[in-house]
Swiss-Prot record:
GO cellular component terms, A-Z: chloroplast
Subcellular location: Plastid, Chloroplast
Family of this protein: Belongs to the ycf66 family.
Organism: Marchantia polymorpha (Common liverwort)
Name of protein: Uncharacterized protein ycf66
Domain of life: Eukaryota
Keywords: Chloroplast, Plastid
Length: 135
């Protein structure tokens, strides 16, 4: 039996299917942001979205609320994880550029710079001897 209706469960199922396809396409579009386990979560999103799309009309209202809350938190954490991965990659590339710039500065400025003066003696400690006075 196949019965579908346009309700909150169908909309939630379509949303999960779209998020699952987005995670799958992310590996092709931005491979430096995607991880290997995103494919697994993409499959889970497609499966749950399909179940909600085709069988969502059977859900009790409290189960539907539970599915909406779980799907909402899942989508939030997916978005946050992708945002942090993208920023981490940007920071790493920026650090590489800064380190390369520092190496070039040290190479060209300080390469021929030599200190001509040498330390003859290093006196940073002075010993003080105490003797007991005899009365």
């Amino acid at each position: 039996m196949n019965h579908m209706e346009l309700g909150p469960s169908t909309i939630l199922g379509v949303g999960l299917i779209i998020i699952g396809l987005f995670l799958y396409a992310l590996k092709l579009r931005e491979p430096y942001v995607s991880r290997d386990y995103d494919f697994f979560f993409s499959c889970i999103g497609l499966l749950c979205g399909g179940i909600l799309f085709f069988q969502g009309w059977r859900l009790d209202p409290i189960l539907l609320l539970s599915q909406i809350l779980l799907s909402g938190t899942t989508i939030f954490f997916i978005a946050e994880s992708l945002y942090l991965r993208k920023n981490l990659n940007f920071v790493k590339s920026k650090k590489k550029y800064i380190n390369l710039a520092k190496k070039n500065i040290y190479k060209y400025i300080y390469e021929n710079f030599k200190l001509k003066k040498k330390w003859n003696e290093l006196n940073y400690t002075r010993h003080i001897f105490y003797k007991k006075k005899k009365h």
